[in-house]
Amino acid sequence: MSQVYDSLSVPQGFQAAGTYSGLCSSRVKLDVAMIVSRRDCSIVTATSQGLMTQSGKVLLLHNGTALPDGPRGHEISQEVCQAAGKCMDEAPDDIALVASGAKGQYFRPSLLIHSLKTLTAGLGTDSQPLEAVLDNAGDVTAYQVALSSGTPGCSLSGVAADGTADSDGLCVIMTDAQAGSAVIEGALAQAKAAIDTENFTFIVMANGMAGNAEITAEGADFTAFMQALNTVTVHLCRAIAGDGEGA
């Protein structure tokens, strides 16, 4: 099936790239993405197992094979993040690894590590490589909104794709608004409550490059941020479901 990807620019301060690592033998499309922020950003990952939060500059996202549970998964994450840090001259703690896909499969971190130079060389402001990595069956969709109220110049860009019988759906949202992990968690929880997000993994990154005052858990700015995140999330998930309504 031929898939034509939307031409969507990522928010300011972000760059993205994608390549094929070969980690998942059943996947012939691009399977690993890199998103880099020019400055530290809040990274919130919400899965069916719970929430993970961290501050950093780099996200590595593999679609195809899930990390093993337990200590081995932690060891792989450390190994890949250390290699990425060395490749990019960043601290390993500033790098996040998310791997979504079939569980119980053999996971070769060396294949992700060998992809790092290709990813860093391909970084750009187009979302198409990220969309290609998320794509499972021609179902990928992208959407972008601008924030209103007291956050002029801020935007949110989202890319999502449905899951398969073996793996969760994926939704990645980037924003140049300045928002901490707690604010993102609160806004994301309200957005997820509006739709069926079971078996979906959400990743939200906020880098503050728009220069707005930090959004707190109360007030008009938080309301605008929550509404924007809700709009993007609902639009993407409904588009995947095929009802054509968006938000």
Each model region followed by its residue ranges:
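A structural signal for small-residue-enriched, beta-sheet-centric alpha/beta enzyme cores
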Residues: M1-A247
